[in-house]
Design a protein with these regions (language model features):
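Interfacial segments of alpha-helical transmembrane regions
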Residues: 1-13, 75-79
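Juxtamembrane loop-transmembrane helix junctions in multi-pass integral membrane proteins
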Residues: 2, 40, 44-50, 70-73, ...
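Transmembrane alpha-helical segments that form the membrane-embedded catalytic/substrate-channel core
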Residues: 11-28, 83-93
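Cytosolic, membrane-interface loops and tails of multi-pass inner-membrane proteins
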Residues: 19-46
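Core segments of transmembrane alpha-helices
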Residues: 49-64, 115
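Short alpha-helical packing/oligomerization segments
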Residues: 61-84
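Interfacial loop-to-transmembrane junctions
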Residues: 88-113
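Juxtamembrane boundary at the C-terminal end of a transmembrane helix
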Residues: 119-126
Length: 126
């Protein structure tokens, strides 16, 4: 069984959570028109968009790495790290923090590290 088979449901589940969060922020806070409401909606939208920008591409790189012989345990570790970094970025960094706290920075840099690591692996195998 490929590592992607284990992690695709986790990715889809977290993306769905972020999608529902956007809908909730837009509808539940619709009655208010305050700067706090607008900021909450914007934060939810950015968290959702950031996931959509980085995760599908990184999933593709990790899938290709595994198809090209990367050890499944390494790929599982990379998916685990990617998920932890995305939660750190979105949930801890953007929703709980003030938007530019340590959780967001670690999440962003960690995501880049996983993406670049997978890309580097693919570059070096040929």
């Amino acid at each position: 069984m490929r590592a992607l088979d284990t992690w695709k449901l986790t990715g889809a589940g977290y993306y769905s959570y972020l999608s529902v969060n956007v809908v909730c922020k837009r509808t539940c806070l619709k009655k208010e028109s305050t700067p706090q409401r607008e900021e909450a909606v914007q934060t939810a939208v950015r968290s959702h968009a950031n996931f959509a920008e980085y995760v599908p591409f990184t999933f593709g790189l990790l899938f290709l790495a595994e198809l090209n012989g990367a050890p499944t345990s390494w790929v599982h570790a990379a998916y685990t790290a990617l998920f932890a970094f995305r939660v750190s970025h979105a949930t801890l960094g953007m929703h709980i923090g003030n938007g530019m706290n340590l959780g967001r920075k670690i999440g962003f840099l960690g995501t880049l590290a996983v993406m670049l690591g997978a890309g580097l692996y693919l570059s070096l195998i040929h």
